[in-house]
Every structure is written in C-alpha cells, then in structure tokens.
C-alpha cells in the first residue's frame, strides 16, 4: 500500500470519527428537545376552558408566550410545515408531532400524538337553578393516540474536507418527518408527498413568517406565485406577484430569508456548512453566484432560485439548487432538499423541460434588465445563458434591440467577446449579430463606439471552429452596411478576413506550383458572410477599393471560388453573388485607380492636332488623301477586324491585374448565360460596363473579346428581364460596348428593339414604372448606338421609337433629365438628312424635334433653369464644328452635371443622380451600389444580415426548435 492510499484511509477514518462526534452532539440536542417537549405537553390539557385560540381552527394546542409559541426554531419549523404546507384541509385530528430524537447513535425515534376524530365523545349535563332556569352544558372529550417510531441511521463516510465522499453511499440516511397522513394515501399506500431516499430531515428552503402571518398553500407551491424561471414563454404573471422594478435588487446571500440550516440550533455554524454548501440563487452585483471553478459543468439535476411575492418581501422561499426539474417531478408538489453533496455542477439544463412539454405553469421568463445584469455575473454558465437568451429576445424584435442599447447592454456584450470560454463569447457574439441587424443604425454605431470591430477581429483570429467563425463574420457583415463603419472594417478586419477565412477555405494556393482544389463547400456559409462584408465595404470610396485590390490573395481567391462554383454547375448561390458583386465593385474606376494606371491610357480617336498640317479650318479638319483612301471612308477601328489578342505576359497575372484579364471576362460571360439570379446578372453586366469604360488599353481589348465570345446577344437579352436593375445594368454595358464601331453596328441591329420597348409610353405600360435613372440610361444608350450609325437610326424609326421620344418630350409629366435625354436622341435623329423626308411624310415636323423645357417637370430641381429651346444640329455640319462625338456638351443641358471623371456612369444610389448625362469627356464606370440600398438587400437579410432564433447557433434556413440551453 503506497503513501497515498494510507493517507486516504487515514483521512476517511478521521472524517468518520468526526461525524460520529457530530451525531453524538445531535443526539444530546434531540434528547434535550424531547425533555423540553414533554414538559410542555404536561401543561397542555384538552378542554374548552384552556383551549388555545388556534384550537378554533383545529390545528395546534400550544400556548402563546409573548406572541410566540414555546419551543425552539426546529419546533417552530415543524409547526409551520403543518400550518402552511399542508393547507387548510382537515387537520383537526393532528395535535402535535415531535422532531426525531436519537436514543443512541444509529437510531432515531419519532413520536406522533394524534387525535382520533371518530373517537370523540360528547358529555351533556343539565342543571336546574333555584329560580327554575335550566342550564345545559356539553363537553367534548377527544381520544388521543401516541405513536412512537424508531428508525435506523447509518453513518456517512466523510472526506478530508468534511463532506460526504460519494453521493451513492449516503442513500437512505435521513427520512422525512412529514405526518403519516402525508406519507400515505387514502388506500394506505405512499402518498404524493413522500420524497426520495436520502433527503434531509427539514427542508433547507423553509422561510417561515412572523407570527400572525398565515397563507394557506393548497398543494405545495402557491398557485399564483411568480416563480422565477428562465425561458418559460407560456406563463402569465399574476399582478399581485409581479415584482416592482423600482428599487429592485436581486436577492443576496446576506438576506435574512436565506436557506435554513438542516441541523438543530445546538450545532455550530461550522457543522452546518460542512453538511451543505450555499445554495444558488440570484445575487446582487457585488457577489458571485457560487463556485468560480473553471471546470464547472452543467448538471441536469440542479434548479435555480424561485421567487414568490415581491422582491422586497422576506416571506418567500428560494428553491434549492438540488431540486429536480422538468418531467422528473410534477410542478404541483413540494419536495424536500436531499443531502447536500460536494457538487461540480451549476444551473440546470432546460432539456427536460423542453422535451417533457410546456414548462411548469408558475415559471416566468426574466425581465430584460435582469438578463442584462446576468451578463456581469462571475459565473460563466449564467453569462452564457444570459447572452444566448438575449440573442433569442432580440430576434426580429427591434424594440428589444433598442432597449438593450439604452440599458447599456452592448458594452457588456462586446466585453464578453474576449472571454476565454467559447460558450460565453459565442453567446455574446450571437446577441451582437441580432442587435446589429435591422434598420436602427444607432445599434450599429453603439457597437462601433464600444470598439466592437477590433474585438470581433481578435475573436476571429482565435476562432478555429466553423460555427463561431460564421457568427463573427455574420456580425461584421451586418455592421458593414453602415457607411461610417465601412472604413473601420477595412482598416481592422480586411487582412484577418482574407488570411483567416477567404484564402484558407477557398482552396486557392499562393504558390503557383501547388495544386488548387476547391474545398470551400463545407465553409460556404462562412465564405458567404465574409464576401458579403467585403462587398459592402468595397462601395465606400476609392481608398477602400484600393486596399481591397492590393490585399494579397484576395482577388485570386475570389476568382477561384467563382470558377469552382461555375464548374460545379452552381452559378446561382449566394456565395457566387457576393463574390461577383465584390469583383464588380473592385473593377469600378480600375483604369484610374490601379498603380501606374497612366501606362494603360490611350488618346481619344479622331482628335486632331490644332497645329500642323491637319489643323482644323472653319469647315472642319483637313485630311490628307492618303489617310482618306487608306481608311476607305471607314472608321479607324475596322469593323472587319474581329480578332484581338491581349498583351503577352512574361508572368501569370496576380492580384488586381486579374480584374481585367481574359479569364475574368469569360467568368462574366458564363454567368450571363447560365445564371438566373437577378443580382448575379446585374453584377456581371455591371462589371463588364466598368471594364469597358474609359480610354485604356484593356478596355479596348475587352470590348473586342466580348464580341468574339458572342456576349453581345446575351447582354441584349437582359433588356427583357423583369427586374429593373438588370435592365439598367445591361443598358449601361451596351452603351460602353458601343464605343467599338463593330459592336455599335451589331447592337444597333439586335438591341434597338428591346431598348425602345423599355421606354415609357405606347402599348407597353410596364416601363412607366421604371425609375428616372433607368429611363435616362436607356435613352443615353440609344443615343450612343445611333450616333454615326444611320442603320441604327432607321431601326429606331421602324420600331416606333420616335413616338415614344416625342411623348417624353411633349407629355409634361416626365422629369427634366428625362426630357433632356430624349431631346438629345431626337436631335441626333434630325441630324440625318436621309431621315428628314421620310419623317415629314409620316407627319413629323421640325418642331417635334425641338425641346421646350417649359414642359419639363420642375419637381426634382430647386434651382432655376434655362427655358430656351435647344438648337437643332445638322449632321452634315458635325465634322466642321467639333470632332467625332462632341457635337453638344452635355454639361450645357443640365446645371447639375458633374465633371469628366464620372461620365457614362450609373447614378450613385446615395443620392447623387446627376452623372448620367455628362458626356463631355471619356467614358465612365458603373458606380458601386451603396447607401440606402446596400449591395445586397432583401427582407430578413440586409446585406444578408442574419438573425437567428436559436441559442446554439445554426444557419437561418434550419432553425432549431429550442436547442439545449441552461436555465438562467
């Protein structure tokens, strides 16, 4: 036998001896009590003359002395159990009962003295006085039966710390002391109040009131009490038991109504605490709720505090932590506390409640201030439960989210993100995710002001499991929809999101020799959240886009993910949508914002030098015969030349260079042909518009490449799409593609009919619902296509385009910008002399092609504008006045037009709607969508903001019906 075993044996023997001494103490105390009770009984007489006032109720026959019953605390507790717990049912037969007394170590003697209600006899005496008056006296004599019960008690092995070694070895140590009528039913069998073996002699959670206060509880718990539970959503709180929140303080260990001792007054306080630990209950903010052991587990056989009465009322009982819950014990019974053990558990799980049906009817869910207060408790189980429950409360409840912010709950949740335990920081992050969702921007600002973004990033770098990473990225996605938080996410979270999520889970490898295999399927939801977050922040400003483009590996991994999804025939997933929208935003202004962008710039064609042999005269620029005949009266860009080769590279393209390479163009074409998702179609067309914008080398290559890949017809087909934003994106892409002369010819033949159908007026009423921006985009595309393209102008006349243009000009119910855009198209058509006679034969007049701005709507413009009519332009004079496409400066057609940098762009949806008509310089880009309509908006998922009505987080599509969680 080694030293440890010897030491263990010695400690066990010592604890046994110590326990025997305690039993001897208890025996002496009980014997003293027995003598005291016997002396009291000698003074009690069952007669009408000295019956106690309480005898009128048939309860007890003890006397009052100075407002109290004679006897010590144990006797009073026993009396209170008879009075209060057993209710007002027939107790007339029960006179008294003594607490158990120990005759010798190992034995307990219980004495019961009862009345026999059937054995009561009445004696009637009649007396006649001298004056003839008769006096009748009736005396009742009751039969008293005394029963003595002896029980055997076995000693309990004690550990070196004075606590029982094993709970299994102490069964049947103590037996309850309820009356026999409560231990048996009407048939003589065990009654409903018999507790399990191993329970204490007296309930530790007795809280007896002062004399004169009496409430009868019918069966155990008060029927209308406002007991404390965690997640009961079916209980209606009675107003008389609802606690007043004013001045409310959670109960503390120092309160006078704490758990009562299980040994008699004769024992010491040390003995008391050796037999049971402190119970769990709600405490004040300065105290913990129990053990702070980091290894605290969640046992299923512990309950929580229950409340009856108001918080300020001391006459209540706290349910002990050993009480069983759920289907194991009915809620309408009273239970004795078992023998306390050295516990390793905390608060109980609600599994049994959820599985066994609805919670007990007397439970209530905690108030919001209570839940927020629990976030600050030192017990980790309470923190995690409170955070999880708070997440549940915030689900689709904007009022609760606002209240959490006003109650200062957000700083506490952000602080819990750094908690070492997963259950705590996961619950806190889930609550922040739901709070950050919705239209109340103040909640997002509050999270930002508490340094929520850096805290989320720290947690993301430590996270290794998918569920936690998903919640973190979802929270960042929700926050990214607010403009003031976007740059903070870029500055703090960009590299963490790229290095910890995008690259490792996409399957892309940094080394060229590594075999890249798609492995993002398992982490698709996490990648979707991350791409959505970056998608939102990419719309902030050029600085954000520059940092995203230059983030090592980000663009490569995004393109790899989209290629893998297309290869797996999954081109409509949310992941593809977010990645393509992010690539579309990164391609915005790419020809100006990439490093050394000037090396790709090209001069505008047909811009003659004002000095030298080709200086312009008053009749136009001089052209040599060689140039004239070498061109063959054709544009510089030969329409017959349909082949184009991208510049040769010495090394593979990486990073931002991939944004304008042939492989990414083929990705967009594949999505245009295969995808059915409107957002993906819009993003693909918008990316093509951005890449084809501007006078730069790769823009020219991409225009030709799209024609070679037969993508023009796919884009033209989008004009018939039922979603307006898809139509608008397709119109913008065709406009920039039409800069190529060959593309312009093809678009004029195949796209003009669809463009005309989308104009307001005529038989098509659906287009009246198109926004001003969409109508202007279509008009500008038509004007770009028919310029220098007589066949396209004829096609416009054949498809009743003139009627719709004149209607926009003359109707008076269109905006000023729409009228100006339509006027430009009408003037371009009138500039072709070949079309004037056919138009006049059809009944059109010259005045129909003039624009009277008095008919334009002034509702959208607070400033004054010119009421003059724009001059008509003769196409034959065009080359004599200004080169190529610059007949009319569009800046002269509206006072709100912008500078050259934003030409041919779609409107910024944050309110800047004045860029569309500015054509004075080179071609512009597709503005990233942002502002009031973030890059991804749909109900329940603002930029795929996500709320989860689950406490163990799951994806939104598979909500868990109340998963396992701990009781608060």
UniProtKB/Swiss-Prot annotation:
UniProt biased composition (Basic and acidic residues): 875-888, 909-922
Mutagenesis / variant outcome for changing residue 477 to A: Severely disrupts cadherin interaction
SUPFAM superfamilies in the cross-refs: ARM repeat
Record PTM Phosphotyrosine, positions in chain: 112, 217, 221, 228, 257, 280, 291, 865, 904
Gene3D superfamilies: Leucine-rich Repeat Variant
Subcellular location: Cell junction, Adherens junction; Cytoplasm; Nucleus; Cell membrane
Cellular compartments per GO CC: adherens junction; catenin complex; cell-cell junction; ciliary basal body; cytoplasm; cytosol; extracellular exosome; midbody
Per-repeat ranges for ARM: 358-395, 398-437, 441-475, 476-516, 534-573, 583-624, 653-693, 700-739, 740-780, 781-826
PROSITE patterns: ARM_REPEAT
Keyword Hydrolase: no
Region Disordered, residue ranges: 855-944
Region of interest (Necessary and sufficient for interaction with CCDC85B), residue spans: 1-357
Induction: Induced in vascular endothelium by wounding. This effect is potentiated by prior laminar shear stress, which enhances wound closure.
Sites of the Glycyl lysine isopeptide (Lys-Gly) (interchain with G-Cter in SUMO2) crosslink: 421, 517, 882
Documented effect of changing residue 363 to A: Severely disrupts cadherin interaction
Coiled coil: 10-46
Gene Ontology BP terms: cell migration involved in sprouting angiogenesis; cell-cell adhesion; cell-cell adhesion mediated by cadherin; negative regulation of blood vessel branching; negative regulation of D-glucose transmembrane transport; negative regulation of intracellular signal transduction; negative regulation of transcription by RNA polymerase II; positive regulation of protein localization to cell-cell junction
Summary of the tissues where the protein is detected: Expressed in vascular endothelium. Melanocytes and melanoma cells primarily express the long isoform 1A, whereas keratinocytes express shorter isoforms, especially 3A. The shortest isoform 4A, is detected in normal keratinocytes and melanocytes, and generally lost from cells derived from squamous cell carcinomas or melanomas. The C-terminal alternatively spliced exon B is present in the p120ctn transcripts in the colon, intestine and prostate, but lost in several tumor tissues derived from these organs.
An annotated Gene Ontology molecular function: cell-cell adhesion mediator activity
Pathological condition linked to this protein in its record: Blepharocheilodontic syndrome 2: A form of blepharocheilodontic syndrome, a rare autosomal dominant disorder. It is characterized by lower eyelid ectropion, upper eyelid distichiasis, euryblepharon, bilateral cleft lip and palate, and features of ectodermal dysplasia, including hair anomalies, conical teeth and tooth agenesis. An additional rare manifestation is imperforate anus. There is considerable phenotypic variability among affected individuals.
UniProt record similarity statement: Belongs to the beta-catenin family.
Name this polypeptide is given: Catenin delta-1
